[in-house]
Amino acid sequence: MGTWVDLNSQRYLVRGDIQRYKVDPTAPVVRQSGRQRLDSLTSRQSFIFPAPNFGIGMRRIRSDKIDDPMMARRSWDSEIDTRFEDAVLAILNEDSTEPTTSGQTIYRLVDSVEFKGDLWGLFDGKQDSDNAGQVYARKYTGSSTAWTGGGGVASDQDTNPLQALDIAVVGDALVALVLGSSDGSDERDYVRARYSADGASWSTPSTQMGGQTGTNATAGGDTQDGKLVTIGGDIYGIINEADVGQIRIWKSTNEGVAWTQQSAVLTGERVNGAVAYFDLNGDEAPVFCTRDGVYAYDTSANVYQLLVRLIPDDNNGLGFTVWSNPFAPAQSLYCSTGDGDIIEYTWLGTSSGSIIRNVGPTKDDGLPTAKQGYVQHMAGSTRWLFYSYGGHAGSKNATILAFDGKGHKIEFDGSGNHFMHKNTTANRRIDWIALSNADDGNLRLHFQERTATTTSDTKFLAEPLVSPASGIAKKYMASGVIDRPETDFGLPRDDAAFIGVFYQARDLGTTDEEYMNIDYGVNGATPSTDFGNIISGTQEVTLASGAGVSGKSIQIRENWNRSSGDSSKTPQANSLEVMYRKKIASLRGWRFTVDVANMAVEQQTPIATVIANLETAEANVPLQAFEDLPGGTTYYVDVTILGWLDEHGRSVSVYEDAEPNISAVQLQLQEVL
């Protein structure tokens, strides 16, 4: 008696032996269009992460994007400097000395401008004896890294607070805006202007503004009620008259000495940012952001033009500047939104109109939880757009990021945002940044961290535009972390042995000096399991003595360190190679001959019925249950009839013509998964 097998809930008698074999798992059952890496299923594979200079925000490389070289240049999170070809530790922040005035308390710096070779900041504070509000102008001295000189811009005539709003240059004068009673009246909700030829002595305009905001000044408050824009020899004050829900513009043609109210009125709230850019006619105009949109003021026609409609949010436009993106076709306007995006608006001319793109860090996978928020301030350079971000809640840390413009190249691509600095105290924003080499020629990225409502700390990053490869002396943070994106190397279903990593790094020392500690996590786990240390003489580390660990995907974390006593040193690194081997699941196949003639006798079933059952199993779309030993393991297989045999074992080519003589049927069964 022969062997019996079960197929599709039917029992069949096998004539002779069952041939068992392995099925090639990389046959066309895997879709080539998905770009799975079938051509690299060798005994050992490796994947190279190049220098991560396409920026943060990529949590995981999609399986079908594994061969996209841009994906491997991204990182999920970073607190090292990834802007250059070789990654290094982030620049060490250094402290600036805040201004002091006897008998007075200075709260914070609101904004700044370069004037006659110096960087001038506008500060607000109070008189200690009676809490009367004060506004000050101070200039930055590079040799002492301190805010000094200057004079008092405005002083409250009673005991009420004042708020500094904005400072600008027109011709040979500084002009400042102040919120509060600063002219002998008790009008605490009025915006007033001041002007100065030297920053030390400040004067009241002969014809003053009269913009009533409806919001009283508060100590250290953040009211966005007035901004200044200079165009040629004219300066415009854009004032939020919140008590009547209107925005009005005042103009001075004589460097802030006298102001004239323009007749056009815009219904809206808040003036969060303002710059000089193009209106819809292609003319340079005051352009500003309100709670619900970006508007241009057509100075010739005395009308407002809507450039970009925004979802209403009080924090729209806090970051608002003009920058020449190296990847954009023209100079662009950048406007942050309250939900964390950055809108790039590019005017191309009256015939071409404008292009609007989202280039912010919220695209792709966004940002890790601790870095989420919205833009607070912006400052552009020839190569990067720097902006402060986040720090608006108890679990959020403010950071400074640098956008290199790459996100402009492909719509919905969030690449190009790089880490510069983090405020280590949560819920403390960075509310001012400025890039300047005044007054000593040394370029600094200045910024201010809020330490409380009425206290702050100004700091700077030295030489923020210079690559470490230049050889210029720089100071670096003591440590930093970067998380590479998680990847399954293009085969998400199959397990791999993750064997080791090799890091193309230099300027390494021992674990007391410059080195990287590598951690990993598999299958979505936090990358916190130790891989080993990359040190001088050891650039490759392995897992389980070279046997590797199993998982479908892996994520690498690099913990960078330098000598605690020497801030001039940093590891430098480029490509990270991950060695692995994908283990493709074995698939089984069976070939055998069903003895339909003897089955018909033993089961008293017509041969035609047995054959019909086999044809049904072949035709069924769902896989068929199969046991090569009755009661044994169940496999799910695809069924193929290979041919028919007569009673003499000869092949019958046409089944229908030879049905009475069919004695056996040849079958092939194969697993698919």
Regions found by a protein language model. Give the residues of each.
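Conserved loop/turn at the beginning of each blade in beta-propeller domains
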Residues: 105-106, 158-161, 219-222, 267-270, ...
